[in-house]
Structures are given as structure tokens and as C-alpha cells.
Amino acid sequence: METFDVKFPKVSDKLKWKDLFPEWIDENEASAKPKCPEIPMPVFEEYEELDAVVAKVPCKHVGVDGSRDVFRLQVNLVVANLLVRSGGWNKNRRVYAVLIGDCGPMWEIFRCEDMLLHEENLWVYKPELEKLKQKILMPVGSCQLALPFSKQGQEIQKNYSKTLFYKPREAYVTVLHSSEAYVCGAIALAQSIIQTNSTRDLVLLADDSISPKSLHGLRAAGWKIKKIKRIRSPHAKKNAYNEWNYSKLRIWQLKDYDKVIFIDSDFVVFRNIDKFFSYPELSATGNDGYIFNSGVMIVEPSKCKFQNLMKKRFEVGSYNGGDQGFLNEMFVWWHRWPSKLNTLKIFRNSRHRNLPDDSYTVHYLGLKPWTCYKDYDCNWDKVESQKFASDSAHERWWKVYKKMPMALREYCALTPEMDARIIKWRKKAKKANLLDGHWRIPVKDSRRLTY
């Protein structure tokens, strides 16, 4: 047996995680095309047709998952690149990775499905090379957009669509739990996806809080229903809004699908996004700092991933007590989608309230459109909610509603409780003489006559 020492320059200690995962990049290339810092690699031509690669994985934080360590990322990428090149781009040689260290390999790169052995601080993998190729063609961080906005993306799309022996099983998925407050939102979401001529399945995970009547409406809207037991967020406060948000982890149990795009049920889709299924897990849009927003993301369902997430949920923290904080600690190496794939309805500049016309989706933060009158965005009636107010975005949601069959519209009915709340805050807005003047708008919403 012949062995080689693989030599490569260690990445500079000056390179920090935030350099690889900046909060913002110039997606439109208005001033310059975004570039990622270089992570040195070996001279790969010197190490061809290896049967196995053995590496010691660095670990700054022993026993803590989600370590944002640039050197750790470098070692994992070196091993992945060596394996892909040794396996060959057009052949399927068996190659193995042996990774040693207390922190273990980065599971974003080395899939648990490919693991042959794990004993203490030793991991052995026989990777599926086509999957690994997709990973190494990605930028080294969220410092650049990937597919399909670059030649890399075209290569991945080509590999992904032509080398698999079967048509990938793909679906959009959302989750409803704990109450029926978002049933209307989920119906509108399904209808909006259908209105873009999507060809993918629609799957909705629902717990026991969703009534048979609502399930009937959700099915009629296009969702395939799968019943689930909700999962409590171990770091959330009792009765907090995100107390049961870990129920989202159930999407990793959808093993009937190769990939799913999760979308929160207070979204509406305005442009077809089927092409984004060509991205690998975990792809999402940026949020604050180096974290991603879990409102829209692509994942690859897997029994072992779900089991690992469930096991780690008590050990790994969450900055916000909910699923987004937890998932950002579990998937520290993620891929940036364009921000227009998750356009947040929030405005820091009060003068400009229109969302971009080319937005793929809109995330309706604040008071939801179906809890307001059709006539205007009721976020205007509360000073603390005005950052979420946009009449144009509100109108776009109601355009989706108007295209829905009449039988589905009843699930978006205005309840007496909703009406009373709106009237209460309209009166307060009038008394305060709020300058936007929306409280002056005559109400013509016909839903007021249905209760």
C-alpha cells in the first residue's frame, strides 16, 4: 500500500468566518461582481486516483457542533476535492474518507447517509460522488451567489439533471401546527405556487390542531396532507410564539422526496421558482450577520439527518429560541440564494414602500393580509407595526386571493374577532391623527357581511 502526505498552505488566521459569510453582497453587481476570499487547496494533479483520504479535522470547540472555523472548513473541502478528483468526473470509482477529530467532519459536506463507520472520534465515509461534486462546485461561503447565476451553476444543473437515473422527486412543503391561524395563508401559498405553473408536488405537514374542515380546504387548495406530532423548541419560553417551531424539523422525514423547498405559510410566490431545486442542501437567503433565513430553504430529507437534529436539539443552542437559530448552528456552511427569493415585507425607509417587481416571493411580516380589510394594510393603524405596512404588497396578496376558487375563499373569512380588532386600532389611529391617514379610508370589504 502506497501513501502520500497531502501538502497545502494553511488558510490565513486573518480570514474570519464573517469574511466567507458576509451579511450583504452586491447581488446585482452594481459596483463590482462579488468575490469570495481564496481558501488554498493542494495541487490536485499531484494526488490523482487515491483510494482513500485520511485527515485530522481541527476542532476549536471540543464537543460543540456548529463550529465556525475556517481551518476546519478548509480541511473538509480539501478532502472532498481530493475524493471527487480521485473518483473521476465521469466514472464511479470507490473512494473513502477517514476523518479523525473530536468535532468530527462537517455534515454539510459529508452526508450521514454515506457514513460506513463511526467510533468515538473516527468517521469513515464512502461518499456518493455526484452529491459531493455539487458541494465542491459551490462558492466557499455566502460571499457569492451560486446557481443558476454563474457557470458553476450551469455545470451543476447539467450534472444534476443528466447523471441521475431517475427523475428527482421534489416538492414544496409547509407546516401548520398549534393553531389554525395560518390555514388561510397556507391555502393562498398553495394557490400562488400553482398560479406560477409549477410542476412540483405540494406537501403540508399538519398536527392535530388542524380541523377536518380546514384539512378539506387545504387539500382542495392543492396540498397533500401528512399528519405529524409537533416538536417543542427546548430553548423557547413557555407560550412564546416560537415554542413549537421545531416542528419544522419534520420536513427531514419526507423521505419520499429527494429535495424539498420549505416555505413558511405566510409567504406568497409570484414567480416560478422550480429551477431552485437544482441547489444542494442547505440553500437559503441571508438574514443578519452570517446566518440564513429559514423561511425559505432547500433541504434533502434523510432519516439519519432527522435523528441527528432531534438528538442535538437539547445540546445545541438557538439565538432566538426557535428553529432558525438552531438550524444556523447545525448548518453553518450554507449557500446563498438571491434575496428576491425571500423578500421580507419590512421597511426601514418610510418613503419607499413598494416591493421589487421581480421578487420571486414575499414574506408577509407583521399583521397578515387576511386579518386586515382588503381595502388597506392594517399595519398602518399601529405605530409599532408601520414598519411592516405596504399597500402595494397588500394588494398583491389580494390578487392571489381573487384568483382562488370561491370555495377556498371562505377559509379566509373575516371573523368578528378580527373585525373588532381592526375597528379598535382604526379608532386609536383616528384619535392619534396618524399622518398616513389610512384610518380615513372607507371600508368596502365584503367579508364583513359574512358573519
PLM feature segments, named:
Residues 1-188, 305-306, 312-451:
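A glycosyltransferase accessory/donor-loop signature
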Residues 2-5, 112-117, 219-227, 281-283:
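Active-site regions of enzymes building and remodeling cell-envelope glycoconjugates
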Residues 97, 202-203:
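Hydrophobic/aromatic residues located in beta-strands of well-ordered beta-sheets
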Residues 158, 212, 221-236, 240-303:
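GT-A fold catalytic core of metal-dependent nucleotide-sugar glycosyltransferases
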Residues 200-202, 258-259:
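Short active-site oxyanion
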Residues 206-215:
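Glycosyltransferase specificity loop/lid
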